[in-house]
């Protein structure tokens, strides 16, 4: 279920300030953030944002198709190592 339209999308204030500052300076350096719940806005297109996954920061390059999604969707928190194989002697 989505967020109410009258409330608007959530974005961390500190993240929005950093993005707007880089837009005014034409700077495209990597922005580190722990705010996985922030919504991707059109202002962020072209920026690389390093999203924390609980262990490390994963760089995410923002494109037009990502608008409206959350930053955490692009930084997986769990590693999938495949299903365990059956042991030969377990019959």
UniProtKB/Swiss-Prot annotation:
Keywords: Ribonucleoprotein, Ribosomal protein, RNA-binding, rRNA-binding. GO terms for molecular function: rRNA binding; structural constituent of ribosome. It comes from the Bacteria. One of its GO terms (biological process) is translation. InterPro entries: Ribosomal_uS19, Ribosomal_uS19_bac-type, Ribosomal_uS19_CS, Ribosomal_uS19_SF. GO terms for cellular component: cytoplasm; small ribosomal subunit. Protein S19 forms a complex with S13 that binds strongly to the 16S ribosomal RNA. HAMAP family: Ribosomal_uS19. Belongs to the universal ribosomal protein uS19 family. This is Small ribosomal subunit protein uS19. The gene is rpsS.
